[in-house]
Amino acid sequence: MRLFDPHIHMTSRTTDDYEAMYAAGVRAVVEPSFWLGQPRTSPASFLDYFDSLLGWEPFRAAQHGIAHHCTLALNPKEANDPRCVAVLDELPRYLVKDQVVAVGEIGYDSMTPAEDTALAAQLELAAAHELPALVHTPHRDKLAGLRRTLDVVRESALPVDHVLIDHLNETTVKEAKDSGCWLGFSVYPDTKMDEERMVAILRAYGPERVLVNSAADWGRSDPLKTRKVADLMLAEGFDEDDVDRVLWRNPVAFYGRSGRLTLDVTTPDATHEGNSILRGAPKGPGGGPAEDPGAGPAGAVADRHGATAVPGA
Amino acid sequence: MTRPRTSPATPGADTADDPLTDPATGTGPRPVAGTAADGTPTGAATDPDPGTATLATATPRELRGHLTARLDEPARGWLRRALDEAVDHPGTHGPISVWELRIAEAGRRCGPVHADAARVLILHAARADADALSRVYYQGTGAERRAVLYALPHLVPGPEGLPLVEDALRTNDTRLVTAAVGPYAARHLDAHAWRHAVLKCLFTGVPVDAVADLDHRAHRDTELARMLTDYAAERTAAGRAVPADLHRVLTLTDPPATPSAPATDHG
Ligand SMILES: [Zn+2]
């Protein structure tokens, strides 16, 4: 079973999580930029964060055999802080980067005029950079937030099939589906959506254009929720093809609209290939996790991955 | 032993009509040569090229020949246009110069395997100086920073690029550390920083083969020998293996060191 978590904040997660995700079958993730829990006070801290999503975090993911891409944006909450809004001027030079597969997460938090402006501006940026957009729906006043979101999307230059509406639930799924957008569901331990409700929605609305994510972050969350949904789908009568569609092919199709998805994990080779121009031909163990050479760390990781045959694969 | 692969995740990729972008999966440009699902090298990886030239030592002409032989036609055409643009418009125009945009998109155009070489070539074509290289580095992804480090020895004759090398050596990203210890570092890093770079390679598992001019700089370096023996003693005391590369470098430091007894005599 191959799994793609299309919305997870790995910066907030440990290497144990990476290992468990790999063992569960996760081979690709998309990490949207978001609010860090502690408010930022300047564009500079956004830029360091973006750089981390394009540098250190994909390196970490690659060490665990997981392909890492990101979506970049000014998040809705901080769009309300005038000290942060200037980051919008820096976004264009980031949106051209290879690993950026969408603009996001954007959308509404408190549905303020400042959020209107940031959402509309960033949908235009997505269209200008031929990128899809990851648009989340607010936690509070969700249905009204969805409707206002869809209005702004329809007024934008971005086609609806380039938009993923996330954090949907029973009250918002129908209107979101009717809009023609892609449908995202965040499965959390105790809020938003759980596995049983997710499977019920899949039964009622079908697997077309549906993406399931863990949205795991620094809050109470579970980076293995994609696997748990897959298992429950199988137990409830969906077949392997349905599971593969929802948990692999749909996210690949959506983010693939960027033309920038690279699902081969090639980066660790750079370590043991030295600086030969003939990278991509593994010669043997070496490199890998920092600060532990003697034991052949990369080899150990590869062994562990090799031994942990993906359950159900 | 090979890294885990996710190639099976792109079904149909091998049969797509357009090898650059697979419409069935939406995956971006794929490398012409690379690694198959089971980790065995394919394409260029098995061709007779001895592979002795490195990104840091190959001339632009060699790099171009290498890429031209390996890229498919759409990627080759893209690279040709990108290099022509960079030659014609090397400066900064508007918020971002055209060649810097090409640097950013080299991965999806040429595939991750060839992106480093393509970026180094674009930097050459644009005659990027130390200021331009700093800008590309500090505004770059990990992959772009790596390419800047590989380009440094060709494009910056003086020590102005050292802050980039020092920045890369502070990271724990082994791809950056590997690229940082090339000929530019050999030429310009002072003794203290260079010794720490060698030690960092040993710590992070970067093969010391990546360290340019290692034989020459390590020769008769008694301070490096002391650092290596202390590190070996620390590993031994902890019951952990001493990296084979450590003994190799210790041997290069020559007379004072006794590789067979690394934990003693050098307090
Ligand atoms: Zn999120």
Predicted regions and their residues:
Chain B
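N-terminal alpha-helical scaffold/docking segments in eukaryotic complex subunits
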Residues: 1-126, 194-267
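Eukaryote-skewed repeat-based solenoidal scaffolds used as protein-protein interaction platforms
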Residues: 116-118, 122-227
